């Protein structure tokens, strides 16, 4: 049944939390179904964010073409709307060459925005309101700002990690400007599929203990492979207050480099935040997406 769906699909997406086995499955399917892989991770678009985002290496690609990796400077902003436009263009290009586009990543909203009729309007910006929120953040801290959003828009707050202060503040800003919550604005979007697609999911059938152990071991391996040095390179360039360094792995080690915590404390936070994010990802995939979950390592 799954093989028939794969053969009929115009586009395949593979979603799953970190350390769930997406890379191995994507390479297997690309080889079997004449596919090319499109990055579906919102942070792997940045140059220099390689180890912390678990970006695939040339060796791991095994000759399979990969697209939309490492094409933006760390200081650049990149929205879901930007991603949607680029990926739809890339899908058309891959299909024109009679190959199968395979989107791979953990950013569920980004994948949905491509596959369904999500429409994005030009968002208003009020610099004074934004600065006021950042001033409030400096005084009260991330948790207090997230609690404020939770009181006003619990649905949106649930989807945003408290440490992702850029998104928390943007959600508060949208509420102030329009009076409409981000969640409510999105409710009537994204219901009509634009492609005959199949979304495969990993991690759902893995026990929480196994997944968390894989995540902890992956963090240890990242540190062995030079994650601290990678983050230090960004920190020394004084890259701050931008989207890229909100990624898990970067903000925790920035705290260490800023002298706010020990290295051990930063690594513990990195592991904890990675586990929490994996839990939120799985909840999102289950509740917000029509995902066909498969076993990690299952032959398709």
Swiss-Prot record:
Residues 41-44 are annotated as: Interaction with substrate tRNA. It comes from the Bacteria. Its EC number is 2.5.1.75. Pfam families: IPPT (PF01715). ATP binds at residues 16-23. SUPFAM superfamilies: P-loop containing nucleoside triphosphate hydrolases. InterPro entries: Dimethylallyltransferase (IPR039657), IPT (IPR018022), P-loop_NTPase (IPR027417). It is an enzyme of class 2 (transferase). One of its GO terms (biological process) is tRNA modification. Its cofactor is Mg(2+). Keywords: ATP-binding, Magnesium, Nucleotide-binding, Transferase, tRNA processing. It catalyses: adenosine(37) in tRNA + dimethylallyl diphosphate = N(6)-dimethylallyladenosine(37) in tRNA + diphosphate. The record marks 107, 130 as: Interaction with substrate tRNA. Substrate binds at residues 18-23. One of its GO terms (molecular function) is ATP binding. Belongs to the IPP transferase family. Catalyzes the transfer of a dimethylallyl group onto the adenine at position 37 in tRNAs that read codons beginning with uridine, leading to the formation of N6-(dimethylallyl)adenosine (i(6)A). Monomer. This is tRNA dimethylallyltransferase. The lineage of its organism: Bacteria, Bacillati, Bacillota, Bacilli, Bacillales. The gene is miaA.
């Amino acid at each position: 049944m799954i093989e028939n769906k794969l053969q009929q699909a115009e586009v395949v997406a593979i979603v799953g939390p970190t350390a769930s086995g997406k890379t191995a499955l994507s390479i297997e399917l690309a080889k079997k179904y004449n596919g090319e892989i499109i990055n579906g991770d919102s942070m792997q678009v940045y140059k220099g964010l390689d180890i912390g985002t678990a970006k695939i290496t040339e060796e791991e690609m095994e000759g399979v073409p990969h697209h939309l990796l490492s094409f933006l400077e760390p200081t650049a902003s990149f929205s879901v709307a930007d991603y949607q436009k680029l990926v739809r263009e890339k899908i058309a290009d891959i299909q024109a060459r009679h190959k199968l586009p395979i989107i791979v990543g953990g950013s569920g909203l980004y994948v949905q925005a491509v596959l369904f009729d999500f429409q994005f309007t030009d968002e208003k910006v009020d610099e004074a309101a934004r600065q006021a929120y950042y001033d409030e953040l400096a005084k009260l801290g991330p948790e207090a700002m997230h609690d404020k959003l939770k009181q006003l828009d619990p649905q949106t707050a649930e989807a945003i990690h408290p440490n992702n202060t850029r998104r928390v503040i943007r959600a508060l800003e949208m509420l102030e400007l329009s009076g409409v919550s981000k969640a409510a604005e999105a409710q009537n979007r994204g219901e009509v599929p634009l492609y005959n697609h199949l979304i495969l999911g990993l991690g759902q059938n893995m026990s929480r203990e196994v997944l968390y152990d894989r995540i902890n071991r992956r963090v240890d391996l990242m540190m062995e492979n030079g994650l601290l040095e990678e983050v230090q390179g960004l920190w020394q360039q004084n890259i701050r207050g931008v989207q890229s360094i909100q990624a898990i792995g970067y903000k925790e080690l920035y705290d260490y480099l800023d002298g706010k915590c020990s290295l051990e404390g930063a690594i513990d936070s990195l592991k904890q935040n990675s586990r929490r994010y994996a839990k939120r990802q799985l909840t999102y995939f289950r509740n917000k997406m029509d995902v066909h979950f498969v076993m990690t390592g299952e032959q398709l």
